[in-house]
Amino acid sequence: MAKGIKETDYKKRFMNGFQILCRSRHSYTVWSDCMALFAITLANTSILPLAKEEPFKSVYTGREREYLRIIKSYEKKEQKLFPQMFALLVEELEKNPNQDLLGELYMLLQISNKNAGQFFTPYGVCKAMTSVTFNRKELGKTVHKEGYASVYDCACGAGATLISASEQCKEMFKKYNYQNHVYFVGQDVDITCVYMCYIQLALHGLAGYVIHGNTLIKPEPELPKDLENIYFTPIWFSDVWTMRRLFHNQDILGRKLKHGCSRD
């Protein structure tokens, strides 16, 4: 067990199920499969109302195909463990939301992708860094002016920095629901990290999305067009954020028209 990480009952039960799946497979493969199945379940549930038409139809179908490919590689008895393990994650985060649950489990299980040199910064460290660097004043100005603001992590890992930033937002906006005024964007080159970050943002009830991509080659704090590489949280499609995107797009269109007229 990694030092400094507390093992709760939920975590212990999750680890028991995980170790059963590892009897005939490498632990990193099992972890990657778990994260993929959990993330696809959440992501496809989020876009289901939009999946009847393109471009979401292709995205939904592709992810369903990937889900079936992974789950069919396990025996029926093993398949039943995945929803049980996912439920344990949900219960643990309901009990204690202020944590990097998946990052801690990753270290607790001593899983590592040695080729990628992965190491997840402890949540306490991320929380300390965020408390020092997070510009509450600037964020407050943006929300007051625009009605909303965004927080972006270009190398999100399991999402610890974004989660700690959401804590700052919660403390800052005590009079109203920060989840309706701040959205969170993560990006990572490792698809398993994308899954981990996405799962945690979704289960924390945060609006936003996580992008699978190389930040050094293509930094994308704005919403890119290739939707197959984007994982939207459920609340991103809430009425509040749907209206915010609508007004934002209208504002952009208005500025373009104004700019075009001024040139004429």
Give residue ranges: language-model regions.
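Conserved S-adenosyl-L-methionine
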Residues: V125-Y231
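Generic hydrophobic segment detector
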Residues: P83, E92-D100, A165-E171, D188, ...
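Acidic-enriched, low-complexity/disordered segments with a strong bias for Aspartate over Glutamate
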Residues: D9, D33, D100, D153, ...
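Class I S-adenosyl-L-methionine
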Residues: A2-K174
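Generic alpha-helical secondary structure signal
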Residues: F14, F18, C22, E64, ...
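SAM/dcSAM-binding transferase cores
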Residues: L223-D264
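Proline-rich intrinsically disordered, low-complexity coils
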Residues: P49, P55, P219-P224, P234
